[in-house]
Amino acid sequence: MHSASVWVSSLTMAAASGWFAATMLAQPATSKEPRFPQLTMDQLNEAQKPLGEQIMKVSSVGLGGPYNPMIRSPVLGQRLYDLFYYLRWQTSVPTKLNEFAILIIGRQWRSQVEWYAHAPLAAKAGLSPDIIAELKASKRPSNMAEDEAVVYDFVTELTTTQKVSDETYAQAKKVFNDQQIVDLTAVAGNYVMVAMMLAMAEETVPPDKEPPFKVGEK
């Protein structure tokens, strides 16, 4: 996961500052009150500050996205942060495939923030723009490499049928070891939880950005 550490430090400062600048802008008069007003570091209490400092070191969205509701429960938030950290930067699954799995969940949930945050990361990690575009269009991507096809089939089958068939598992064993299969399962489940957190909190992309999924889009 050395490649992740190369881009994360530069991405954090630029993206986090941009997210904060956008999310702290005044909302249109017709918009409803946010369920969780965006917090900044100087608003955090003593229980929240240590977690906030950790988040700001690695997050591409600052304290936005799932971190905004999550930090309201700092003990739980710390446990989740530790899980996020492993599944993003220490997982045994290669970065490109890990981000692909996250996008699959983001598309299933039509999670605006999840897709907005992770589509650029997937592309940066080497996932083909065509694969990203076809997935966004709710299609099974064509021209996938063997390991990409395994990720798509494994994650999609597990999350839509609540099981993994012997055939799909056998295909996974051809390209992944036991630890990678466990980590792939965990990242899929984790980002379902992230999508749920984002949906509950009604977190949105920055107001000056276009949501990835249009209203009514299946």
Residue ranges of each PLM-predicted region?
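Hydrophobic alpha-helical segments
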Residues: 22-218
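Bacterial N-terminal signal peptides that target proteins for export
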Residues: 1-15
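Hydrophobic alpha-helical membrane-insertion segments, chiefly the h-region
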Residues: 16-21
